[in-house]
């Protein structure tokens, strides 16, 4: 398939799901507002799902981009809310998908760069409510491993500041060719101060001028719905 030359995507404007490739447990459906909504995993045990652009996106030499999306993590299981989701740039292909559980549907996808939104503490995690940068399908977080305000989020239903609290969260991710910046807000569309800014050479990691862009998520013994809406990428 040809690469998308104009580096601009707006999920609400998509008229056909052919613009996105859906893998594993993921589905695309019409939300309450009439626009497309991505369900990466249902609230069931042992799920893994991903959604990527069907065609690769052509970047400039520095991989400069900005993206905004909203997510909700709802209906946590008896063992707790788990496991989380990632936003990913990768060159493996539109059908890329890793394992479930703590692998978040991301482990093993390489070459790649991801921003992780993690809601379950595995042995390699700092806590059960953090954001991190991942590369090349490896789940050992790069620095900074940044907790978001609240820790010990099990169970987290209704707890402000826990990413799995069922609220609508807004996410801004920007890359200027040198620093990857991430900001998130609970129940707000006003951008706060950056949660993290991390120096990283995405062009060198991916090794080519185009990449597939999208999301992954996973559940284990614990589970939750992982839902994405209002995604804009440019």
Name the predicted role of every residue range.
Residues 1-15:
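Sec-dependent, cleavable N-terminal signal peptides
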Residues 11-234:
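Polar, low-complexity loop segments and adjacent catalytic/binding residues used for recognizing
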């Amino acid at each position: 398939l040809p690469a998308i030359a104009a580096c601009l995507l707006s999920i609400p404007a998509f008229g056909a799901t052919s613009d996105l490739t859906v893998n594993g447990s993921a589905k695309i459906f019409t939300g309450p507002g009439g626009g497309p909504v991505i369900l990466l995993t249902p609230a069931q045990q042992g799920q893994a799902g991903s959604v990527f652009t069907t065609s690769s996106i052509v970047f400039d030499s520095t991989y400069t981009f900005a993206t905004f999306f909203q997510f909700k993590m709802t209906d946590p299981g008896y063992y707790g809310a788990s496991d989380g989701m990632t936003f990913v740039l990768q060159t493996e292909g539109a059908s890329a998908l890793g394992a479930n559980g703590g692998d978040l549907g991301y482990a093993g996808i390489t070459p790649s760069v991801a921003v992780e939104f993690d809601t379950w503490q595995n042995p390699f995690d700092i806590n059960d409510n953090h954001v991190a940068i991942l590369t090349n399908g490896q789940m050992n977080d790069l620095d900074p491993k940044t907790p978001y305000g609240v820790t010990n989020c099990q169970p987290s239903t209704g707890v402000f500041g826990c990413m799995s609290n069922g609220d609508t969260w807004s996410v801004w991710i920007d890359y200027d060719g040198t620093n990857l910046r991430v900001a998130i807000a609970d129940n707000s569309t006003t951008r706060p101060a950056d949660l993290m800014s991390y120096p990283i050479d995405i062009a060198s990691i991916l090794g080519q001028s185009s990449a597939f862009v999208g999301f992954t998520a996973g559940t284990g013994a614990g589970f939750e719905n992982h839902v994405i809406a209002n995604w804009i990428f440019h």
